[in-house]
Regions:
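Short, glycine/charge-rich beta-strand/loop segments that flank catalytic centers
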Residues: 24-32, 82-93, 141-151
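Polyanion/phosphate-binding surface patch
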Residues: 26-57, 185
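Short, surface-exposed recognition loops or helix-turn segments adjacent to catalytic cores
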Residues: 138-149, 170, 243-249
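Acidic, His- and aromatic-enriched active-site or binding-groove loops in soluble protein domains
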Residues: 43-54, 158-184, 239, 268
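Short N-terminal amphipathic alpha-helices
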Residues: 15-30, 44-46, 59, 78-83
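Phosphate-rich ligand and nucleic-acid binding surfaces
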Residues: 148-149, 153-160
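Positively charged, Gly/Ser-enriched RNA/tRNA-binding surfaces
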Residues: 2-17, 28-29, 64-76, 84-137, ...
Length: 385
C-alpha cells in the first residue's frame, strides 16, 4: 500500500514537470553495463549474470546505463533535451542489510541532451516535492550537493594516477554516510573486515594521503563553479532544503560534474530496535560522457534516483506517518442459497466505485470475520441493508 502511494505521487509530480515515461529492458549485455559499474575492471562483480549462447547477460544494476544505450540508438528520433522518468526493478549482487536489498524498485528521472545546470537544480527540486508529497517534512531530509570536480582536484593533490586506486578510493568515500568516517578510513587504507568476517580490500593510501582527504572533507564552502551556479538556481526556485557537502562522492565512475544525495535527518532503527547509519535514500548527478560509450555522440545528461523500498522502510519508521485510504468491503456469506442477493449488493457497491468482494472461501462467520480482520476490510453484516 505504501509503495503504491509513493508511485502514485511520483507519477503525479513527473507529469506536472513534463517528463515522459520510458521502459528499458531488465537484461543488458554484461560487457555493455560492466564499464559503468563501481568496479569496471571486474564487470561480473555486483551483478547477477548468466551465459547465453556465448554472450554474458546481466540483470540491470541501475536504470541509467540502459537509458544511455537507448539514447545512443534513438538519438536522431528523440527530442533534445529528452526528459525521461522510469520506475523499474534493479538488482545488486551485494550483501543485504536494513533498508538495503538485492532486488528493489528504483525511480529515475533524467535530463538528456543539455548542459544547462538548471536541469540539475530542477531534479533536486522535484525530488524534494515527491518526498514531501509522500509524507516527509522539510526537516526530515536534506539534499546534499557536491561536484566530481572536487574529487578530481583532490586526486591531483593526492597524486593518485592508478585507475584501480581511484575507483577503490571513490567507493570507500561513497560509504562514509553508511559506515561513518572511522570504517571508511579503513577502506582508504589496507582494508576492512565487517561484523560477518567478510574482508574488503582497501585503496592502500598512505596515512598522509588519508589526512589530506579528511581535511578536504571538512570544507564548508563550495569552490567549484558548477555547484555555485546550482545554488544560484536553487535561490531562484526558493529551494532551501540543500547543503553543500564535499563528502558526497557517489561511487560510480561515470559522474562528471554536480552530484547529489538525499539523506534523512531522523533516526532509523533495524528490526532489533537499534539505531543504524541508514545512508542515503537517493542520489544522482551529471554524466556528460556516458552516452558516448554507446556511440560517437556528444550528449550531456544528468539524472537522479530514489530507491523506493528504502523510502518505504524509512517512512515506516515515522510514528506520525499515515496513508489516507478508503477501506474496501467484504460481504460475508450466511446462506449459499442467497447468492443472487449478495451479488446485487456487490454490484451496487462496485457501481459506486467502492472496492468490494463476496467472501471467496468456505466457513462459518468466525472464519469469515477472521479473514476480514487479517486483510483489514470493513465487514458487511446481516440485515445492514
Amino acid at each position: 500500500l505504501i509503495r503504491d502511494f509513493i508511485i502514485s505521487n511520483i507519477k503525479e509530480v513527473m507529469t506536472k514537470y513534463g517528463f515522459q515515461y520510458l521502459e528499458t529492458p531488465s537484461f543488458e549485455y554484461t560487457d555493455s553495463i560492466g564499464k559503468f559499474l563501481p568496479d569496471k575492471e571486474r564487470p561480473d562483480q555486483g551483478v547477477f549474470s548468466f551465459k547465453d549462447e556465448n554472450k554474458w547477460l546481466s540483470l540491470r544494476y541501475d536504470l541509467t546505463a540502459p537509458l544511455a544505450r537507448y539514447v545512443a540508438k534513438n538519438y536522431l528520433e528523440i527530442p533534445k533535451p529528452f526528459k525521461r522518468y522510469q520506475l523499474g526493478t534493479v538488482w545488486r549482487n551485494e550483501k543485504p542489510g536494513p533498508g538495503r536489498f538485492r532486488e528493489f524498485l528504483q525511480f529515475d528521472a533524467d535530463y538528456v541532451g543539455t548542459k544547462n545546470l538548471q536541469a540539475d537544480a530542477e531534479l533536486c527540486v522535484l525530488i524534494s516535492e515527491i518526498l514531501e508529497k509522500c509524507g516527509l517534512d522539510k526537516t526530515d531530509y536534506t539534499v546534499k550537493v557536491s561536484s566530481r570536480k572536487f574529487t578530481d582536484k583532490l586526486f591531483e593533490q593526492l597524486k593518485i594516477k592508478s585507475k584501480d586506486q581511484i575507483s577503490t578510493t571513490l567507493r570507500a568515500l561513497d560509504k562514509i554516510d553508511r559506515l561513518g568516517w572511522g570504517e571508511a578510513k579503513k577502506l582508504l587504507g589496507e582494508g576492512r573486515k565487517d561484523k560477518s568476517g567478510d574482508y574488503t580490500k582497501g585503496a592502500n593510501l598512505k596515512s598522509d594521503q588519508i589526512k589530506i582527504i579528511e581535511n578536504a572533507l571538512k570544507s564548508k564552502t563550495p569552490d567549484s563553479e558548477d555547484v555555485l551556479e546550482i545554488i544560484k538556481i536553487f535561490q531562484a526556485y526558493n529551494f532551501k532544503n540543500y547543503k553543500f557537502d564535499p563528502s558526497v562522492i557517489r561511487g560510480l565512475e561515470y559522474y562528471t560534474g554536480p552530484i547529489f544525495e538525499v539523506n534523512l535527518n531522523f533516526e532509523v532503527k533495524n528490526s532489533k530496535g537499534q539505531a543504524i547509519q541508514f545512508g542515503s535514500i537517493g542520489g544522482g548527478g551529471r554524466y556528460d560522457n556516458l552516452v558516448s560509450n554507446f556511440g560517437n555522440l556528444d550528449c550531456p545528461a544528468t539524472g537522479i534516483s530514489i530507491g523506493l523500498d528504502r523510502l518505504v522502510f524509512a517512512l515506516m519508521q515515522k510514528k506520525d506517518f499515515k496513508i489516507k485510504s478508503t477501506r474496501p468491503v467484504i460481504i460475508c456469506v450466511f446462506d449459499k442459497d442467497k447468492t443472487k442477493e449478495y451479488v446485487n449488493i456487490l454490484n451496487k457497491l462496485r457501481a459506486s466505485n467502492i472496492s468490494s468482494e463476496i467472501y471467496p472461501g468456505e466457513g462459518k462467520l468466525k472464519k469469515q470475520m477472521g479473514y476480514a480482520n487479517k486483510i483489514g476490510l470493513i465487514v458487511k453484516r446481516k440485515n445492514s441493508y
